[in-house]
A protein has these predicted regions:
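Membrane-interfacial catalytic/cofactor-binding modules of polytopic membrane enzymes
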Residues: 240-296, 302, 306
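Small-polar-interrupted transmembrane alpha-helices in polytopic inner-membrane proteins
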Residues: 42, 46-53, 149-169, 230-238, ...
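Hydrophobic cores of alpha-helical transmembrane segments in multi-pass inner/ER membrane proteins
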Residues: 126-132, 190-207, 296-303, 354-367
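Membrane-interfacial, low-structure loops and terminal tails that flank and connect transmembrane helices
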Residues: 3-32, 208-225
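Membrane-interface helix-loop-helix junctions at transmembrane boundaries of multi-pass membrane enzymes
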Residues: 139-153, 305-323
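N-terminal signal-anchor transmembrane alpha helix
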Residues: 36-76, 234-246
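Individual transmembrane alpha-helix segments
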Residues: 90-128, 278-297
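Interfacial helix-loop-helix junctions of multi-pass membrane proteins
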Residues: 57-68, 162-185, 245-255, 331-355
């Protein structure tokens, strides 16, 4: 009996411990995370540049200089005097030329044409960079598990942006419109920042292992994450309001600060019927709302920064300090815009970028 018991214990002790089964994150394909991250960084930089070029296109009144949408053949600019005259003749048919720029010379037309052509050409290059990267990584089977849909989604947003761009331009080619519709301009700019935001988010996600991201989500400061995300959303609303200001040239109506002319409120802000249209079409009221949201955004950002400036994590403190510094810069640029009729789309890009960093760092305390 003793021998039999001894044999049983010997058998149990001799059995090796089973290896732990790998989790889903460990089993998932890693792919070329670093290469894909670098590729998205290039796209991010190009989208930021395109926002800046789009701002200059708007400021120089160049957006309606090309009256047709030719995604492929339009990549070749006029190469002869006859081709230039043909393009100029098309521009002469739209209200902007007939009511505002009548008498413009061919050389002056070339100046605005190159801005719009460059803006569209940059969009084509971004699409080409995305397509080459996506299908190249896909063919090489280097896309990490779970990332094919995300990258395809990013490209889909880019294609949609091109269509919305033409939808915006077409609004200024008929009737008595001298510029594109401000609603469509806001939609176009808003989607550009959405693309920029997703690209930034993907860049930060790809910079860390999936297991690290999971651990960071579990230990993150959800309250700080929620506040900074709310700040990012408020900044996005402010960008849309800025597009409305640019769309109807509301900034030129009251080039003074801190007052709107001689008073705090703009005179006669509700002259358009129905009432709600004043918030989108009355130059004084649109600029006033833009200013008030700017003040609220700065105060809210200052409160969040004050609470996060002594956090235990150095990366988080740095991110919030950078965000607050950019907000201070944006306030100064906003005041200069009101006084000197200048705009800065690139500073808005930096603003949203820093806010995105804050959202990520506040969630991932172990960054």
């Amino acid at each position: 009996m003793a021998d039999k018991q001894r044999a049983i214990f010997q058998d149990v002790e001799s059995q090796a411990k089973p290896a732990a089964a790998p989790g889903g994150i460990d089993r998932a394909g890693k792919g070329a995370r670093g290469a894909i991250r670098a590729w998205i960084m290039v796209i991010f930089a190009m989208v930021a540049l395109m926002i800046a070029v789009g701002g200059m296109t708007r400021l120089t009144d160049s957006g309606l200089s090309i009256t047709e949408w030719k995604p492929v053949t339009g990549s070749v600019p006029p190469l002869s005097e006859e081709a230039w005259m043909a393009e100029f003749e098309k521009y002469r048919q739209i209200p902007e030329y007939q009511l505002q720029n009548k008498g413009m010379s061919l050389e002056e037309f070339k100046g605005i044409y190159w801005w719009e052509w460059g803006h569209r050409q940059l969009g084509r290059v971004i699409g080409l960079v995305w397509a080459l990267g996506f299908f190249g990584f896909l063919a090489a089977r280097k896309i990490p598990t779970g990332w094919t849909g995300r990258l395809l989604f990013l490209g889909g947003l880019g294609g949609l942006q091109g269509a919305i761009g033409w939808w915006m331009v077409s609004s200024g080619l008929g009737g008595e419109m001298l510029d594109v519709a401000s609603y469509r301009l806001a939609t176009h700019l808003g989607l550009a920042f959405i693309i920029l935001g997703f690209a930034a988010w993907y860049i930060f996600l790809l910079g860390r292992r999936e297991a690290d991201l999971m651990q960071a989500r579990r230990s993150g400061d959800t309250r700080l994450f929620g506040r900074s995300t709310g700040l990012m959303h408020l900044a996005f609303i402010q960008i849309l309001l800025g597009a409305l200001v640019a769309g109807i040239d509301a900034g030129r109506a009251f080039p003074t600060w801190p007052l709107m002319g001689d008073s705090f409120l703009p005179p006669d802000p509700f002259t358009i019927t129905p009432l709600w249209r004043n918030f989108f079409e009355d130059a004084g009221l649109v600029q006033f709302v833009h200013r008030m949201v700017a003040y609220a955004l700065f105060l809210y950002g200052a409160v969040i920064w004050w609470g996060a400036r002594r956090g235990p994590n150095g990366h988080t403190r740095f991110a919030f300090n950078a965000m607050f510094a950019v907000m201070l810069l944006q306030v100064i640029l906003g005041i200069m815009t009101a006084i000197k009729s200048k705009h800065s789309f690139s500073s808005c890009a930096m603003n949203v970028f820093c806010l995105s960093i804050c959202s990520i760092f506040s969630q991932n305390q172990n960054v």
